[in-house]
Amino acid sequence: INAIMGKVEEYKKDFNIQPYQWPEKFGIEPPKIKRYMPDTDDEFPNHVDVLDYETARRFLVGFLYLDDNSKGQTVFDNQDGASFDCKRGSLVLFPPMWPWIHRGEKPVLKPKYLMRLPLL
């Protein structure tokens, strides 16, 4: 958790987040490990991570990649097609609302594993 919080602090610096833009106290939703299998329709189509009352508390989401996988990137369609490779130990942080529509492409050769970590 300390390493993840260190990356969150980097995110805040990179985007010049001011104290009035960040909650004084926050937590992390229970982590969820996701597995996507190759040679199946295992992928996650375009979506956002805040859809209803229950998920509206999320203000930042992290994907921690648990393995190396050259295929199965996370793609942000409305951010100039930015994509992030599945590289073990890498962490992608992004706001969960509608401007950050993203998808998880399906892996090709081996399973893809990631941990989802929404901040509340």
Ranges and model annotations:
Residues 1-91, 99-120:
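Fe(II)/2-oxoglutarate oxygenase catalytic core
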